[in-house]
């Protein structure tokens, strides 16, 4: 419900307007900046900034990310990496065999999984699991290790 008269109009004649005699709505009542994160503003920090306090991990300057982590992909998803128009060309012409370099898509390791199409396929990657090798060779395809 809206008020006919603002609060400031109601407080005319009351010197401090509800802000007290000494402080008079001045200075930094809650501390400056982000002060009080562990005491009087703790609820605010835990609700809106839960990771503000404390440490989290460590930066390793000399680590080579690529050698530490190689993103895997299932061999079941290999046919899905070929654009639709090209995929239909390969399905219509059995002599054509697609060559997929998974590193172009940001993957490095091919893991096992049933191929979605029982057609030969050539796959290039940094590493293949034994089950992935078996699955690719079973349909008459080839796997090539690239560095």
Curated annotation (Swiss-Prot):
The source's superkingdom equals: Eukaryota
Record's Pfam families? Ribosomal_L27A
Q: GO biological process: what's one of them?
A: translation
Give the span(s) annotated as Disordered.
1-34
Whether Cell membrane counts among this entry's keywords is: no
Record-linked InterPro entries = Rbsml_uL15_N, Ribosomal_uL15, Ribosomal_uL15/eL18, Ribosomal_uL15/eL18_sf
Gene3D superfamilies xref list: 3.100.10.10, 4.10.990.10
Q: Can the keyword Transmembrane be found in this entry's annotation?
A: no
GO function terms (MF aspect)? structural constituent of ribosome
The UniProt entry's GO CC annotations, sorted and at most eight, read: cytosolic large ribosomal subunit
Bias-annotated ranges (Basic residues): 1-15
UniProt keyword annotations, A-Z: Ribonucleoprotein, Ribosomal protein
PANTHER family, A to Z: 60S RIBOSOMAL PROTEIN L27A, LARGE RIBOSOMAL SUBUNIT PROTEIN UL15
**Protein family:** Belongs to the universal ribosomal protein uL15 family.
Protein name per UniProt: Large ribosomal subunit protein uL15
**What is the native source organism of this protein?**
Encephalitozoon cuniculi (strain GB-M1) (Microsporidian parasite)
The organism's taxonomy opens as: Eukaryota, Fungi, Fungi incertae sedis, Microsporidia, Unikaryonidae
Q: Which gene encodes it?
A: RPL27A
């Amino acid at each position: 419900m809206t008020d006919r008269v603002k609060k400031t109009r109601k407080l005319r004649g009351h010197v401090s307007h509800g802000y007290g005699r000494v402080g008079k709505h001045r200075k930094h009542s809650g501390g400056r900046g982000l002060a009080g994160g562990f005491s009087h503003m703790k609820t605010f920090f835990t609700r809106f900034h839960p990771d503000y306090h404390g440490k989290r991990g460590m930066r390793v300057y000399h680590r080579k990310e690529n050698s530490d982590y190689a993103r895997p992909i299932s061999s079941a998803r290999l046919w899905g990496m070929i654009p639709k128009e090209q995929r239909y060309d390969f399905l219509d012409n059995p002599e054509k065999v697609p060559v997929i370099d998974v590193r172009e898509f940001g993957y490095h390791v091919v893991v096992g999984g049933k191929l979605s199409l029982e057609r030969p396929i050539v796959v290039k990657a940094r590493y293949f699991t034994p089950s992935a090798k078996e699955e690719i060779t079973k349909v008459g395809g080839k796997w090539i290790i690239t560095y």
